[in-house]
Amino acid sequence: MNTEASQDQTVTETPGVRLRQARESLGLTQQTVAERLCLKVSTIRDIEEDNAQANLASTFHRGYIRSYAKLVHLPEDELLPILEKQAPVRAAKVAPMQSFSLGKKHKKRDGWLMSFTWLIVLVVLGLTGAWWWQNHQAQQAEIANMVDQSSAQLSQNGGQPVPLTDDNSDAIAPTDAPAPVANGQPVPLTNHSGSAITNSATTSSVPKTTSTEPVDTANTNTTMHQEGAASAAVSPSQVPQPGMPTGQPPLPTADAGVSGSASSVGALVMNFTADCWLQVVDATGKTLFSGIQKGGAVLNLAGKAPYKLTIGAPGALTISYQGNPVDLSKFIKANRVARLTVGVE
């Protein structure tokens, strides 16, 4: 009976139990054993409880047990037969290895996913390109329509762009008009429509002499031309008023010097660096200018503010309103027809 009991006790003593008993007999703790073997405390606990870790290979597990046995002075020959008996049981618990077909399925699925992603990217790029092309074609068609309208207006005006303004409005300020000369001296011109008196009007106002009186025709003509040239330089403010002495010549007033600058108040000044189609409409709906201007031209327009401008090529000109520059940078960067309102208070 004692022999059978000892055999049962030997069989029931697993490697973990024997290692734990040897550790306790030496007075060591699990923490001490773990530090000496450079293992985790949980690994030492699993070895003593005979719990094989699923993610740990059997080779490493046996190596840990051998190191543990050497530390607590247990012979390896007593533990290895017990480990060999437990090996089939542990081998049955090992999960089967995945086949290569599963990896191929994953790769195939990843390939389809990448193909679908590239397809979406190509569709987005195609739609973006189509949208840009449609906008570009619409802009080109709009510019071509403006050019056709301008060409039709040029053909009606005899090939010259003529701004549509009132007779008394200074739509285009003359810049290179020569000044008249009286007695060898330049005479300033004024912009008042009622201040200019022509030579023919002066001539008609001279009373005709009768044939009975001898008249020196040469002196008469010279006097008439001198009077006509002098009267052309007289502004309305210089006309003698009733009650003023007629013997003294009228003095020049301040209106004669500032008449040219007064007409530029509220005016638009445009300097063209290249050929450009332009249309300007004032607040009354009157078209001040509509046509093509050549590069190097300077256009001065005056009307009732605000002005509505349509510019075919914003980068081909610079605009200033009342001496202040007008910003066209956003239209130049967008490379499109500029539609803006200038002079809004």
UniProtKB/Swiss-Prot annotation:
Residues 229-241 have a biased composition (Low complexity). Residues 133-345 are periplasmic. The keyword DNA-binding applies. It is found in: Cell inner membrane. Residues 188-225 have a biased composition (Polar residues). PROSITE patterns: HTH_CROC1. The chain crosses the membrane at residues 112-132. Residues 30-49 bind DNA. Residues 19-79 form the HTH cro/C1-type domain. Gene3D superfamilies: lambda repressor-like DNA-binding domains. One of its GO terms (biological process) is regulation of cell shape. The helix-turn-helix (HTH) motif in the cytoplasmic domain of the N-terminus is involved in the formation of spirals to maintain the rigid rod shape. As this protein is anchored in the cytoplasmic membrane, the HTH motif may contribute to protein-protein interactions to form the RodZ helix, which is localized beneath the cytoplasmic membrane. The C-terminal domain may be critical for determination of the rod shape by probably interacting with enzymes required for synthesis of the peptidoglycan layer, including PBPs in the periplasm. Belongs to the RodZ family. This is Cytoskeleton protein RodZ.
